[in-house]
Amino acid sequence: MGMKKSRPRRGSLAFSPRKRAKKLVPKIRSWPADKKVGLQAFPVYKAGTTHALLIENNPKSPNNGQEVFTPVTVLETPDVTVAGIRLYEKTTKGLKALTEVWAEQLDNDLGRKLTLVKKEEKKTADALDAVLEKATEVRVIVHTNPKTTGIPKKKPEVVEIRIGGSSVAERLAYAKEILGKTLAISDVFEAGEIIDTLAITKGKGFQGSVKRWGIKVQFGKHQRKGVGRHTGSIGPWRPRRVMWTVPLPGQMGFHQRTEYNKRILKLGSEGAEITPKGGFLNYGAVKNGYVVVKGTVQGPAKRLVVLRGSVRAAEDKFGLPEVAYISTESKQGN
């Protein structure tokens, strides 16, 4: 593809306004149409990146049967606790919460994040059955357990996760079964599965137009006057305002982004077998279970990442490639 005649910017306007995300926990706005009963997402923490050697299993590839170098991301997966159940009704204005029920025993650390419901005010499971006919969606409220990881904090993150299934009654029965229990990553996903990753990206702060939008650096008299990295024109005399489409300096990074169709290469329960010598940079050792995802995942180390079942997965023609080697060499340059 040749150079465009007009290229006012490199970035997409679809992501505007490019401002900081309100919360570190990403919003999940869509879910896969999965008839399998179970959770459709799982929150994890990003530990770091390394590389692996995979055996190419595409018969049409020139590297078929050979080892191929690929970057991989390691995510720590401490068990999550199911704290509550919430039912929704579909209305003309979107989903409307009908009722919610909380577990009898709640973790004290959850009180650092939410105002816990008093014991005498808690609803029973009968409140769920009373509105079952109206309900169209069943979700569970889960919280992470960061105190079991190397991340220096006790306050958990709270995520609302949809339960998949063919009927509402079937989903509700599963939700009642897991209420108050802890779930592992192996209860939701398995090796070889295609997933989406949702997270808040690395924050870059206030950046100029060249870095933020990829505009052209001006030379000649513009550079001599010290305005080589400025926007050439910010618009005409009329209308007497600057349009929102003009590439201007501002916030870069710390936005919510979704990356689609990532493959899970490996699931494990012993973090020591995946931790590199000296630990991951800015993270340390993996103390719980882990998941290895092919490619990169947005966000810095220690960032919460939500793994969701793929909403637009294509046909998986070749399946899970054989993992010949995962590097655990030091990432500190030693």
Curated annotation (Swiss-Prot):
Q: Which domain of life is it from?
A: Archaea
Quote the Gene3D superfamilies the UniProt record gives: 3.30.1430.10, Ribosomal protein L3, domain 3 (4.10.960.10), Translation factors (2.40.30.10)
Q: Which GO terms describe its cellular component?
A: cytosolic large ribosomal subunit
UniProt entry tagged with the keyword RNA-binding = yes
What Pfam families does the annotation carry? Ribosomal_L3
Any one Gene Ontology molecular-function term assigned to this protein's record: rRNA binding
Keywords, comma-separated and alphabetical: Ribonucleoprotein, Ribosomal protein, RNA-binding, rRNA-binding
Provide the GO biological process annotations: translation
- Biased-composition ranges, Basic residues, are 1-10
Show the segment(s) annotated as Disordered.
1-20
Family statement: Belongs to the universal ribosomal protein uL3 family.
How would you summarize the oligomeric state and partners of this protein? Part of the 50S ribosomal subunit. Forms a cluster with proteins L14 and L24e.
Instruction: Write out the function statement from the record.
Output: One of the primary rRNA binding proteins, it binds directly near the 3'-end of the 23S rRNA, where it nucleates assembly of the 50S subunit.
Q: What is this protein called?
A: Large ribosomal subunit protein uL3
Q: Which organism is it from?
A: Methanococcus maripaludis (strain C7 / ATCC BAA-1331)
- Lineage, please? Archaea, Methanobacteriati, Methanobacteriota, Methanomada group, Methanococci
